[in-house]
Structure formats: C-alpha cells, structure tokens
Swiss-Prot record:
Enzyme class: transferase
Record-listed L-homocysteine binding positions: 435-437, 488, 603
Catalytic activity as recorded in UniProt: 5-methyltetrahydropteroyltri-L-glutamate + L-homocysteine = tetrahydropteroyltri-L-glutamate + L-methionine
Protein name in UniProt: 5-methyltetrahydropteroyltriglutamate--homocysteine methyltransferase
C-alpha cells in the first residue's frame, strides 16, 4: 500500500503578516516593484520550506498569490476586461482588476463558496482572446525546484469551476467558451508535465453542486484535455462538501487521482463509496483533517475512517491531506501561550495540521503503536475540553429550554410597524444613512494600540473615542445625512468586538486569516457556551445620540455573522451556538432601546455565506439562521426600527430568507455587482424597507453624484419609494477621510435630486 502526505494550499499572509505589509507598502509607493517582487519571492519560498520541514511530501506550488488565486487564473487565461486595456504592466493590470483605480471600476468581488474568503469574479467579454497569457504555475514550480530542490505539486483552478465562477456570458455561450478553455489548459498542463511535475492538483470545488448534465459536460472537457496530455498525472480535487450525487460519474473521469472531503462531505462521500467503490487504478486523496477550523483532529476517528475506506475501495494508493486549502486557518498556534491550557492544547493551526497529517501517515504505514503516546495525548485533550465548565453552563441551558414561539416574532406586521416608526422618527422620503463605520485612521489605530499596551489610561482612551465620535457626528450633520452613526472607533473588527464582551469566546494574538486582498481578519474562537455579561455598545451609542437632535442608530453584529466569522466549537450543532449568541444580543438590543435608541442595526453580512453548497440542504440552514435573527430582534417595541445589512452575496438564492428576517429596513451591497440584485427585484417583490448600496466602498475612487443617482433611479423602478433608503455598499472603516466626505456629499445630493424628481412626477 502506497500512502503519501499532501497539502492542498498554505496560508499566504506570513506568520507576522509579512505578505499583507508588503502589498500595502507597494500600493502606497513605499517600496518599488523590484523590492515588492523580491520580498514576495522570499515569503513564497519560506512557505514551501516550512511545509517541507513538517514532512509533507506533496507540497502545493502556485497556491501563493499577490491578491487572489481566481484572479491569477483569470489573468493567466486572458480574461482581462477591456476597460483595463490602457494599463501595460502585469502588476498594474492585475491590481486595477482587483482594486479599481481613480478612473476604473474594479472587478466584482464575492465569497469563495461558503467561506469568508473573497475572490475576484472573472469577467468574460465578447471578442475576448482566450489563451495562456502566462504559465505562472510553471514559473513557480521551476522556482521551488531550483531554489529549494522541492519537486512540488502545482495547484491550478480547474476549467469548469473557473468558468462557473465567471460572469459576462449567456447560458447559451457557456459550452462554447468552455471548449475554448481546452487549448490553454492543455498548454498549461503539457508544459508542467514536460518540466517534470509528478502530480498536478486541479481544483474543482464546484463539483459538489453540479447537475448530472453539467458533470457530463465537465467530463467531456477532461477527456479532451487527457487526449492531448495523456501522461500528465492529474489529481481532480473536490472540497467543501461531498460529490455524492455525481460520484459514480466522477470516478470515471480520465484522471489518476481524486480528492474527496471527508470532513464537510464525510457522510455523502462514504455513502457513495460504499455503493460504488473506488477504482483500483486511481489514487484516493482523503481530506481527513479539517482545513476550515482550528481544533485538533480526533485521530481515532480519522484512523477509523481509513479502516472503513480500506475495506470498501479497490485502490491501494492513498494520499493523506486536509479537507481543503489551509488558507482558511491561521499559520501557527505557538504564539498563543496566553490562552488557557485546556484551550491551547485543543487547537491546531495550519502547521499543527501538517503535523497531524504526518502522524496519521505514521499510524497507517507503521501501525498505531508508532504514535501510541500522541494518541493518548490527543484523547486526554479532547476529554478535558469536552468536560470544561465553560462548555456546560446551566444558565445557558435553562435560557434555551425556556424559549417560546412568541420569542421569535414582532408584535405587529411590518406595514403597521413602519407607520408607527415614521411618526416616531420623522424621516424624509428616501432617507440617507451609512452602514456604520467611519475611517480607522492611523491615529485611531495607534491610539488603540497605545491603550492596549498600557501607554495611555482608560480615561485618555475614552476621551479620544468621544472626540472622534463628536467629530464625525458633526461631519454627518454638515453632509446632511438623515440617520447618523457613532462611527465605531472603539471597534477593531465587527465580530471580535462583541466576542471580547461575551462569555464563551476567546481570542488569539496572531490567528490571522485572509479575507480579501490584503485584508486579514482574526476570527474569535467560540470555545464555550455564549452568554451576555454587560452592555457592549450602550455607552458609545448613547453618547453619540446626546450630541445631536438627529436619529443615531445602534450598531450590532448579528448572531449568524458572529457564528460564521468565528472559529466555532465542533461538539454541538452550529444552530445551538447561533441561538446562544442571539439570546445574548437580545439583552443588548433591549438595553439600547431602554436607553432611548430608536433605530438599531443588526448586521448579517455573512448570512448567505453560511449556506450549504447543496440546494437540498438550504432550507434547514435558512430556517435556523432566520430564527436566530428573529430571536435577537423581536423583543423591541413596534416603534423601534430594526435595520440589517448584507454584502457580497448571491442574493437571488435568499430573497425569501431576507423577507423572513422581518427587518424594518435592509441595506444591501449592489454597486460592485453592477446591479444584479436590482435585476432580481424585477422578478420578485420586496415589500419592506430597503437600501441598495449606491457606491463601492472597497475602491479608493470617489464616485460622482450622477453615478449614484443612476443607481437610485434604477432601484426606484423596482422598489417602492415609500420604503427606499440611500446608503453606501458597506462600512467606511477602510477608506480615508478625504475619500469618504466627498462621496457622502455626492450621495446626499443624489438623494435630494431623486426626491425632487419624485415630487415633480407626483
């Protein structure tokens, strides 16, 4: 029996976020292109070497990127929109596509399947010349070979997933464009094979959710590629779910190895294998370590999985690997010594997961006796965390048991509530607001750092936050916004902030993961039962309201987003954790309301991303996700207006869920997706308050009043003006003050123009 260890992808950002810092230094012209490329190469090779030193045999090459691996593939295949044609250098084109420029709108960005990573959406245009513009995987393969002597495993995004993630073509064009991808993929694979690549990983995560017709279509493409590259050793890699529905066909694809996810698709993949077996002439790559969470593996469970597989499959060749790329986990837990022993011992970040793969490999090749001590350690760790007092709170259990049906609904229906709210709030037609955060300047970040390091006192820090809050309340009044926000200057991250103030959470010092581009997040760790402790947002919100006669809205992050943007305990269902968070937020919302706050926004930007990949599993998730939001928000008076916000999602799938949230107003990202949600509303009605974002806050460019007015105009064709709000796409935390103020002034002017037009037409 031949067994190898492999990794699907390694975190890009560096142990001290060197990758992020290098990118941002280059963007701000602090380093030149030569220094940028040199530093990036050093980081890239350091990551390859780290995996080699951990004992990984099949080391991924080409998973490293300057921004996003889907963007890399788009550039490589010539999917470069014509609006970027005036840029000549590779990096100028590449970063303009990713980030936009003063005069160019960036390509759309959206969630990578149901993760919190974002990819740049490839754009197809008529007349596009599809060809292999740059064999980047080959360059990086040869680099690792020459510099480190590592014969790596090139990783590429497969043609079917790539085109399915792209936009700009009609369904009728799909098959034609797909066939046009054969030639560049043949060239790419031929050159890699000729250079000596022993195995090439071709990622096709979309295979988890294809129809039978689509799988047949994909198979034909792989047959066409195989015909031209008969000797390349291809590993067809799936992840994020099982391929159960199409497994029988997928195992006949002309590839030498198939990778399956036995963490997030364990039940389905095992069921398919028990029914259809696995070909003797292929290698089974077993995703047996969770690539999306941070907990130590249950080694006994993994070894039992292999025992089951060895009984049911014909092959004698296995690859031991994570369930997906380790992009979604922090790099190393060694710096987290501040954590309690029971929690620290239970964690496994990327480097620890690689060590687990090597342990499993040892057990499979040399017998479990070879890792007897490690197995005993793992069993003790799991027992300790399971029996922890933090995971067994009686008060949390009692609150959950006491829930009644009426805890999940508002007293009056929306139309009646909204009438009462209009009387109470006295807002104009087409009210303007922002999504919540304002620029976190260098001064804001530096002052917070000084406070955390004990350089300044609590009192000095609070005075600084109050000064920033007052400054931005005045800015908002001068701009002419209708509903104001306090600016969130006290918050580093919209999830971390709440986690720090709730029981059941813990925080890493260096547990960073990439969200999009150079933006990294440090997800909280939900390790115990979640419970309310004290007010979390009351002081800052009430202070902001005391400064103005205008309405100030409270700002909270919703239960499902806190759940989906955290590393979550894996010993109870996610639904139960979500309900615990919702009950804690319910306390906070009641406190805000009793403190005189009449508009409360509960953001759920991550509602869509938590959906399972398979449509058959959607209803169960949506039901408890919606119930969690309702549990958090339903105890307020009818006169209190509940807002929510969502961004970066395929909203067409969840229009019914959005409606079921029963929020009085929802604001949605629409400008970057170039009006797709507006198109959705042409085919369905939405009869509650809604704000469709009028400008993309992820780009530094300041859009004109006319651009925003155009989106308002389009929106009012599908939305009732009585319920329509005007706002940016998302929070403004990452933008500069000199970008934010003119953009908001243009937005308010666009709103005034739209009001005038409505009055004229009336």
């Amino acid at each position: 029996m031949a067994i190898q260890t492999s990794n699907l992808g390694y975190p890009r950002i560096g142990l001290q976020r060197e990758w992020k810092k290098t990118l941002e230094a280059f963007w701000s012209n602090k380093i030149d292109e030569e220094q940028f490329l040199t530093t990036m190469k050093e980081i890239r090779l350091k990551h390859v070497k780290a995996q080699q030193e951990k004992g990984i045999e099949l080391i991924p090459i080409g998973d490293f990127t300057y921004y996003d691996h889907v963007l890399d593939t788009a550039y490589m295949l010539g999917f470069i929109p014509s609006r970027f044609s005036e840029f000549t250098s590779y990096l100028d084109v590449y970063f303009a596509m990713a980030r936009g420029s003063k005069d160019h709108v960036a390509s759309e960005m959206t969630k990578w399947f149901n993760t919190n990573y974002h990819y740049i959406v490839p754009e197809y245009e008529e007349g596009l010349q599809i060809s292999l513009k740059d064999n980047r995987p080959l360059r990086l393969y040869e680099e690792a070979k020459q510099e480190l002597g590592v014969d790596g495993k090139p990783v590429i995004l497969g043609p079917y997933t790539f085109l399915k993630l792209a936009k700009g073509y009609t369904q009728e064009q799909f098959a034609t464009i797909l066939k046009q991808l054969v030639a560049p993929y043949v060239q790419l694979l031929s050159e890699l094979h000729a250079a000596g690549a022993q195995i090439i990983q071709v990622d096709e995560p979309i295979f988890a959710s294809l129809t039978k017709e689509e799988v047949q279509q994909a198979k034909e493409i792989y047959e066409a590629i195989r015909k031209e590259v008969p000797n390349a050793n291809l590993l067809l890699q799936t992840y994020f779910d099982s391929v159960e529905e199409n497994y029988e066909e997928i195992i006949t694809f002309p590839v030498s190895s198939i990778g399956l996810d036995f963490i997030h698709g364990k039940e389905g993949n095992l069921h398919a294998i028990s029914k259809y077996g696995f070909p003797a002439d292929k290698t089974l790559a077993v995703g047996c370590i969770d690539g999306r969470n941070i907990w130590r593996a249950d080694l006994d469970e993994v070894l039992t999985l292999f025992t089951t597989l060895q009984k049911q499959v014909q092959t004698k060749n296995f690859i031991v690997q994570p369930s997906c790329s380790l992009l979604h986990t922090p790099i190393d837990k060694t710096e987290e010594t501040h954590l309690s022993t029971e929690l620290f011992d239970a964690l496994a970040f990327a480097n620890q997961k690689l060590e687990e793969l090597v342990l499993i490999h040892s057990a499979l090749t040399q017998g479990t006796e070879s890792i007897r001590n490690e197995l005993e350690t793992y069993r003790n760790v799991h027992h300790t965390i399971r029996s922890s007092a933090a995971r067994n709170r009686e008060d949390v259990k009692a609150a959950r048991t006491a829930l009644k049906e009426e805890d999940f609904s508002r007293p009056l229906p929306f139309e009646k509530r909204y009438e009462l709210q209009q009387v109470a709030l006295k807002l104009p037609l087409l009210p303007t607001t922002t999504i919540g955060s304002f620029p976190q300047t260098t001064e804001v970040r530096q002052t917070r750092k000084e406070w955390r390091n004990g350089v300044i006192s609590n009192e000095q820090y609070e005075q600084f936050i109050e000064k920033e809050t007052e400054k931005w309340i005045r800015y908002q009044e001068e701009i002419g916004l209708d509903v104001l926000v306090h600016g969130e200057f006290e918050r580093t991250d919209m999830v971390e902030y709440f986690g720090e103030r709730l029981a059941g959470f813990s925080f890493t010092k260096n547990g960073w993961v990439q969200s999009y581009g150079s933006r990294c997040v440090k997800p909280p760790v939900i390790y115990g039962d979640v419970a309310f402790i004290n007010g979390m947002t009351i002081k800052e919100t009430v202070y902001a309201q005391s400064l103005t006669e205008k309405v100030v809205k409270g700002m909270l992050t919703g239960p499902v987003t806190i759940l989906n943007w955290s590393f979550v305990r894996n010993d109870i269902p996610r639904k139960e954790v979500s309900y615990q968070i919702a009950l804690a937020l319910r306390h906070e919302i009641e406190l805000l309301e009793s403190s005189g706050i009449r508009v409360i926004q509960v953001d759920e930007p991550a509602l869509r991303e938590g959906m399972p990949l398979k449509e058959k599993d959607w209803d169960a998730y949506i039901t408890w996700a919606v119930q969690s939001f309702l549990l958090a928000t339903s105890s307020v008076a009818n006169e209190t207006q509940i807002h929510t916000h969502m961004c970066y999602s395929n909203f067409e799938d969840i229009v019914d869920a959005i409606r079921a949230l029963d929020a009085d107003v929802i604001s949605i990202e629409t400008s970057r997706s170039h009006g797709e949600f507006i198109d959705t509303l042409k085919h369905t009605t939405y009869e509650k308050g809604i704000g469709l974002g009028v400008y993309d806050i992820h780009s530094p460019r300041v859009p004109s009043k006319d651009e925003m007015y155009k989106i308002v105009e389009q929106s009012l064709k599908v939305c009732d003006p009585k319920y329509f709000w005007i706002n940016p796409d998302c929070g403004l935390k990452t933008r500069r003050t000199e970008e934010v103020i003119p953009a908001l002034e243009h937005m308010v002017q666009a709103a005034k123009d739209a009001r005038s037009l409505l009055k004229t037409n009336a």
